Regions:
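Bacterial N-terminal signal peptides
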Residues: 6-16
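A surface-exposed beta-strand-loop module
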Residues: 37-38, 46-50, 54-56, 60-162, ...
Length: 680
């Protein structure tokens, strides 16, 4: 499962930035090294052909039927067969799996295009296609010398798909061949175009996706196409199970230096521990960034192991693929050292602020969310007067020749971390050995800061009584110059400016989540437990972070403002859940594909939030009413204690513990309401 938590559709638009130009740093030459996938990156037609009429073949959940036309053998430049180029009339039938997954795929196809639902399958027609196979999957087609090969049409097909924002293919094909494993990738000229990937080796998934370029993009916008997944099928597991972990990221050390906007310099050391034998690392990485209608590439100056030896790599398409000098045995450790310049430091909208957000790829991370569980150490240099903030406890905060310098360290493993800097003033207080820091954007807001400090410590103490020890020794509440959302990186809360109004906890403020700023602040504090003490294994289980934080915040709001506020919140959840319940089950909410458009697809975003947050919280509230507060919150505390050190927590883990604690089988209930679309 790829680490793709809500790819911002705003990336489809180039947001003008305020004047902040500076000459970009001159990149140093990257260390020459053979690139994984290089033999498969420039394929050619061999000149051998076969009659395609009546041929059919199956890969994974897909069945291809070639009605008319020709197949032309595709090889590497040294003549190794890797697949075929098809010209003619073909059809694809794709089975999404169980009935709920099939419903979701049909919904996505109707919403996004590319295929139509027929008899429970997705079907599409295509006129040209390229099929690439590892040797383990390659059909026994018989090719023979033929007429003049369609070299130009093949080149045009390759070029058509060359700028798609999709994962690397050539490097994965080499990885599969090296492992003597299965791999298949197809590019289909359809309406709109399709990509089909079957990859049990590096990603344990099969994906059918649409690629298209939306209308209405600004003039001069980079020539690229964007993708949406019609269907994703896990391989070798069910979607209820955690994704396979090949190697786990266990330590991250970063040195961040702000440069002329939008550039900065980063030096990163990452330590991995092999869980299975591995010869390659496939990592998500922000290799390209859209800035003022330009596509700026991350400049990797050096990539070595811990001893400084250069490693072969392939960089691009949002990924870094690293070939290891020798296979890692289970339990073996490897350190990567990276030195790169990156255009991540944009002051979006002209704000006096830049951010390196969680799960954005600003440092390389494994594709599977549950493969990242790392400590974090950061040294950050921000240009004065900007103050920097980062996940972790403060080691030092100093000034050096025009820089404000921050060093932090976090020993508790986390799935991701953040760094940001801006024009902030701070105030803080320490209670029970926990320091809370409030960072006000722009002008100082002393009254709001004092109130937020008081609110934080009050909610924290309540949660410690309810859920157990607070996991952070420091917590920073950072004002974001916007409205309507909150986010909880490790040891931090990013919250928009209505939280810094002096009327906090008295005014009704419009909310993104469910019930205004009161509950939103409590929700974000609850993530210290639900998100970091226990964390969801994959997007199918994201409700463990979000809905559980919702139900905890409900109890906090009841204590702060009375039972009536809790009833209002429960009513909001129920109404939102009813609105979106039929869109998908909760476990498939992150599979709802938004339209490929130059504007925000708000309906899909609302459905996802109402399922993961509202319906999930509604289910937990229903359980609370049935079990009573004592037993319900005892189950939550037991859940936290039982799975604190496990990185692969799933919904079935919670159901099993709930059933044990209550001496009742809750599986049928969750089948209907969590894995199904019914409402309790």
């Amino acid at each position: 499962m790829r680490l793709e938590y809500g790819l911002a559709l705003g990336l489809l638009l180039a947001v003008p930035a305020a004047a902040q130009d500076g000459a970009p740093p001159v990149p140093a030459a990257a260390t020459p090294a053979p690139s994984p996938g290089a033999p498969y990156r420039d394929t050619v037609l061999s000149g051998r052909t076969a009659n395609a009429a009546g041929l059919s073949f199956a890969v994974g959940a897909a069945r291809y039927e070639l009605g008319t036309g020709s197949l032309w053998e595709v090889t590497t430049k040294d003549g190794t067969p890797v697949g075929a180029f098809f010209l003619g009339a073909g059809t694809l039938a794709f089975s999404a799996g169980d009935p709920q997954a099939a419903r979701l795929a049909a919904r996505n196809a109707k919403h996004v295009g590319g295929a139509k639902e027929v008899d429970g399958e997705l079907r599409a027609t295509f006129s040209r296609a390229a099929f690439l196979f590892s040797a383990a999957l390659r059909p026994a087609w018989t090719f023979a010398a033929g007429e003049e090969p369609p070299v130009r049409r093949f080149a045009a097909h390759v070029e058509r798909f060359a700028r798609d924002r999709t994962p690397q293919v050539a490097s994965r094909l080499e990885i599969a061949e090296a492992a003597r494993g299965a791999y298949f990738a197809a590019t289909l000229e359809a309406d709109p175009d399709l990509r089909h990937v079957f990859d049990p080796v590096t990603d344990d998934e099969e994906v059918l996706r649409v690629v298209d370029r939306p209308a209405g993009l600004p003039g001069g916008f980079p020539q690229m196409r964007f993708s949406r997944d019609l269907s994703r099928r896990p391989l070798g597991r069910t979607r209820r199970q955690a994704p396979r972990v090949d190697a786990r990221l266990v330590a991250v050390d970063v040195d961040v230096r702000e440069g002329p906007a939008p550039w900065g310099e980063l030096k990163v050391a990452e330590t991995f521990v092999a869980v299975r034998p591995v010869s390659f690392l496939v990592l998500g990485f922000a290799t390209e960034t859209i800035y003022r209608n330009d596509l700026l590439e991350t400049r990797l100056r050096a990539l070595t192991d811990g001893d400084g030896r250069p490693l072969p790599y392939a960089l691009g398409d949002g990924e870094l693929v690293v070939a290891l000098p020798k296979p890692l045995a289970p339990g073996a450790r490897l350190t990567l050292r990276l030195d790169y310049e990156a255009p991540y430091f944009e002051r979006a909208g002209g704000d006096n602020l830049w951010e390196l957000p969680i799960a954005s790829g600003w440092y390389p991370q494994p594709l599977a969310f549950n493969s990242s569980h790392h400590t974090f150490h950061a040294v950050v240099r921000a240009r004065k007067p900007f103050l920097a903030f980062a996940s972790g406890e403060t080691v030092r905060r100093t000034e050096e020749d025009g820089w404000n310098v921050l060093e932090t360290r976090l020993e508790k493993p986390v799935p991701f971390a953040t760094v940001l800097a801006g024009k902030y003033t701070t105030q803080e207080s320490t209670e029970d050995g926990v320091t809370c820091r409030v960072a006000s954007y722009g002008i100082p807001k002393e009254m709001s800061g004092k109130m937020l400090l008081s609110v934080f410590h009050g909610v924290r103490k309540f949660y410690e009584w309810l859920l157990g020890p607070f996991p952070w020794k420091e917590f920073t509440i950072v004002e974001i110059n916007d409205y309507g959302f909150g986010q909880a990186p490790p040891g931090m809360m990013r919250i928009t400016k209505e939280a810094f109004q002096s009327s906090i906890f008295t005014d009704e403020v419009s909310s993104l989540f469910s019930h205004g700023i009161n509950q939103r602040v409590a929700h974000e504090i609850a993530h210290a437990w639900f998100g970091y003490v226990v964390a969801d294994a994959s997007p199918e289980h994201q409700w463990i972070s979000e809905a559980f934080s919702e139900i905890a915040s409900m109890y906090a709001i009841e204590r702060l403002k009375g039972k009536a506020e809790g009833k209002k919140l429960a009513g909001t959840w129920a109404g939102s859940a009813r609105h979106s319940a039929k869109a998908a089950p909760i476990d498939l909410a992150n599979g709802l594909a938004p339209k490929i458009a130059s504007t925000w697809d708000s309906s899909t975003a609302i459905d996802r939030v109402e399922l993961v947050y509202s319906k999930g919280a509604h289910l937990l509230h229903t359980l609370r009413l049935e079990l009573g507060d004592d037993l319900f919150f005892t189950v939550l505390r037991s859940f936290l204690r039982s799975f604190e050190k496990q990185r692969d927590v799933t919904t079935d883990d919670f159901v099993a513990l709930l059933s044990f604690a209550t001496k009742k089988d809750w599986k049928p209930w969750f089948e209907r309401y969590y894995y199904g679309t019914e409402m309790p």
